[in-house]
């Protein structure tokens, strides 16, 4: 349930139980910029909406023969460390993920939230492509801290891919949005985080 959360916070709730920050941070940015299709971004059934949007993007990449991007997404997701519950991503496949989404049809939000394998890794290039391909937004990727509003990528350890990228968040003004919450700074969200990339668009 949304409780007392703002609509902008509601956009990111799915990331509080799945690793889907590449999508939810993008949704937050799109919502803040008053982009259309707002019914996708908040309200009831948000888990199902998020999964449907991810499936649509993956199916679009398959239909358009974007095998390189699909391989990057698959490889990045396989590099996820096991979760606290022991969920392992080392055998993740795009087709298996789509099948899992298909099996989610008709399940309750509460049941879906428990399934950590709905997580998926989005390399920076894939986030930029998603904005362009699915939302017709020309995004700019900067592999350093620019201080600009946008989707920020952070690191906290020595993960092997994309400069240690471990999470995406949305920054607007002096606020950071992630996991369905609002923070006054990146360090308030996690003191170990440091910004390593910014994806901006208008």
Where are these regions (language model features)?
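Active-site nucleophile-adjacent alpha helix/oxyanion-hole segment immediately C-terminal to the catalytic cysteine
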Residues: 1-73
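Short, well-structured alpha-helical interface segments that form or flank functional binding sites
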Residues: 16, 20, 24, 122, ...
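Conserved active-site-adjacent core of cysteine acyl-enzyme catalytic domains
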Residues: 56-162, 172-174, 179, 189-193
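Conserved catalytic-core surface of thiol
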Residues: 180-202
């Amino acid at each position: 349930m949304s409780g007392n959360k703002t609509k902008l916070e509601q956009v990111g709730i799915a990331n509080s139980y799945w690793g889907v920050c590449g999508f939810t941070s993008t949704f937050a940015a799109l919502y803040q910029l008053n982009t259309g299709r707002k019914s996708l971004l908040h309200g009831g059934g948000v888990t199902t909406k998020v999964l449907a949007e991810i499936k649509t993007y993956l199916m679009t990449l398959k239909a358009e023969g974007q095998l390189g991007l699909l391989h990057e997404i698959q490889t990045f997701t396989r590099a996820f460390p096991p979760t606290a519950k022991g969920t392992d991503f080392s055998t993740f496949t795009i087709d298996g993920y789509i099948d899992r989404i298909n099996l989610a049809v008709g399940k309750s939000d509460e049941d879906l939230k428990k399934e950590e394998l709905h997580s998926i890794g989005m390399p920076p290039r894939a986030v930029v492509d998603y904005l362009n391909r699915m939302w017709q937004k020309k995004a700019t990727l900067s592999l350093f801290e620019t201080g600009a509003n946008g989707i920020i990528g952070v690191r906290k350890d020595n993960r092997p891919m994309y400069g240690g990228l471990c999470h995406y968040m949305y920054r607007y003004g002096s606020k950071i949005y992630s996991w369905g919450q609002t923070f006054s700074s990146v360090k308030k969200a996690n003191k170990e985080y440091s910004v390593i990339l910014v994806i901006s668009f208008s």
